[in-house]
Amino acid sequence: MNLSQEDWVAQLGADENAVILDVRTEDEFNDGYIENAVNIDINKGQAFIYEIEELDKNKNYYVYCRSGARSAKACQIMNELGFENAYNLLGGILDWEGETVNP
């Protein structure tokens, strides 16, 4: 499900069962990420699928990438794998107005 930044942040803030998932490359992730995000690179192909399948399907996943395209695809893949609650951040981190962690 696609959510605007406002809705994504509001829903995430009220969700005690939330996981933030960053599907960008490791290099992109290391340039800055949303606090508490877990990085699983969607460009890894089958390895991405394997890592996603290890996640708890009972959690709610708030997914983002650079602009929203890869995270939309990740949410679609997650839905196909049986994850019922995967929320795509429209506009990605490019449009993110919140704070980021810069390692």
Regions found by a protein language model. Give the residues of each.
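Rhodanese-like catalytic fold shared by cysteine-dependent sulfurtransferases
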Residues: 1-19, 26-60, 66-103
